[in-house]
Amino acid sequence: EPTAGDILVNGIPVNPKTQNISYIFQEYSSFPWLTVEQNIRFGLEIKKVSKAEADANVEEMLDIVGLTKFRDYYPSQLSISMLQRVAIARAFATKPELLLMDEPYGQLDIDLRFKLEDELIKLWKKTGTTVLFITHNIEEAVYLSQKIMVLTNKPTSVKTILDNPLPLPRDVVSEEFVALRNQVTDLIKWW
């Protein structure tokens, strides 16, 4: 058990008050007593972003995730995909340098998953945010990633890191896509 030390990101100590990291979890998480707009604004208020900047960021995120008409709705009034879009908008609204996503689409059906994956690609392109996307879904990893890190069954052991040279958006039935998916599958089978 560590008793002392530092956590570094890009060589800089992580300070909870100044960190520029956002998170999206498998379980969509919204504050039930806040509206969609207030949920998206939450991280901006914690970071003490000016009202003008917060207003602009919230408007931009509502537009990008297609929830402008639902800004005054509460989480109990939203579908699962809408709740996940709120989580995505809240995470990107703070303009993080690093976004950690842990199985964010695990509970969604395939159509919603594809739609949100495409929205996520648009956000990545627009913001330039570095994203660590954790998934058990090989096709999702190949579809979204620039690099694929295959872990072993030991928590901190990396089996390999593969570059994904396929251009975005990716064609899931192309020979190149299928070949890379099969390569990742083979790596997982043989540890």
What do these predicted regions represent?
Residues 24, 88:
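Hydrophobic anchor residue at the start of the ABC signature
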